[in-house]
Design a protein with these regions (language model features):
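Glycine/proline-enriched, intrinsically flexible loops and inter-domain linkers
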Residues: 1-74, 80-318
């Protein structure tokens, strides 16, 4: 699908060039980039000048630190102080780190703009080489794409004081045997902001996938969905509450291997401006708590319960 999309894009670009000529097409490409740069610069101008620092930790203790310096319509984002690359696959390639930065900038703009390099023109980004946000080419990175990317967004929003932390994980769940494999991700609580409480049971930031309908899941696989509901009270308490996470219980009707890749099981989503943190997530098999990253052999009758994190709250409720 990706190859086909690229080929389609190349054909359409050839059609544009044939119709309007390279000078006109190149000029409009530049206009689009200039527009993105201008809108980003205007958004930065609305932020207070000065330095804004924040740090957070992954569940295994690895630190992600950032210092953002705002000067008028320009911004410097420096991840100095972030820990070195890890021995596991929670490292995020530089491209993923830059994607998280670009996402935050587009949120700042507050209106739809084409995704292009113009958004980054008013911004200087410094990422220490060899850190977990810019590891060497031989470093493992798969989980960094879906988990660490969330924490990068959290520290950027934390430094700018824009929102409390959202659930901060994709809650990746996979199971299967020699005949089938299934993969799903679960939403959780969104962080509250100065204007409104966080949404409940949603994917945030780097994730946007949906769960399979229970009827389809139970028809195709030896699985029974026992519970799928909001995790009431898991959002942080404050002037604006954080969103609630989810509870999902799956009963296995046959033996299978089960893996869970998740975060925010140790370090809770932070609150902002005196708001309380969201509840940490939990992974349980037959009532026994599992690690945040784990693979186990499940038997028929076993029940996997995933409780996803709530979002942090904004402001003191008093």
């Amino acid at each position: 699908a990706q190859i086909a999309a690229n080929e389609k894009g190349a054909r359409l670009l050839d059609e544009l060039l044939a119709r309007y000529g390279i000078e006109v097409v190149a000029a409009y490409m530049q206009h689009i980039q200039d527009n993105a740069a201008e809108l980003t610069a205007r958004a930065i101008e609305r932020l207070p000048d000065g330095q804004h620092a924040f740090e957070d930790r992954l569940d295994d203790g690895a630190r992600i630190a950032v210092r953002i310096t705002v000067r008028g319509s320009t911004m410097e984002i420096d991840f100095e102080g972030t820990d070195d690359a890890l021995g596991n696959n929670l490292n995020a390639p530089r491209a993923v780190t830059m994607a998280a930065v670009l996402y935050v900038l587009r949120v700042l703009v507050g209106k739809p703009i084409p995704l292009n390099s113009g958004c980054l023109r008013p911004v200087t980004v410094r990422i220490p080489k060899g850190s977990l946000l810019s590891p060497d080419p031989d470093a493992a990175v798969a989980a960094g794409n879906v988990e660490t990317s969330q924490r990068i967004v959290d520290v950027l929003f934390g430094a700018l004081g824009l929102a409390a932390a959202s659930q901060g994980t994709m809650n990746n769940v996979t199971f299967g045997d020699d005949r089938f494999a299934y993969y799903e991700t679960l939403g959780g609580g969104a962080g509250a902001t100065e204007r409104q409480p966080g949404a409940s049971g949603v994917h945030t930031h780097m994730t946007n996938s949906k769960c399979t309908d229970p009827e389809v899941l139970e028809t195709r696989f030896p699985i029974r969905v026992r519970r799928f509901e909001l995790r009431s009270g898991s959002g942080g308490t404050g002037a604006h509450a954080g969103g609630d996470g989810l509870i999902r219980e799956l009963e296995f009707l046959a033996p299978m291997r089960v893996s869970v890749l998740s975060e925010r099981r140790v370090v809770p989503p932070y609150g902002m401006r005196g708001g309380g943190p969201g509840a940490r997530g939990m992974n349980l098999l037959n009532g026994k708590e599992l690690a945040h990253r784990v693979t186990v052999e499940g038997s028929a009758g076993d029940v996997l319960r995933v409780e996803t994190p709530g979002g942090g709250a904004w402001g003191d409720s008093t």
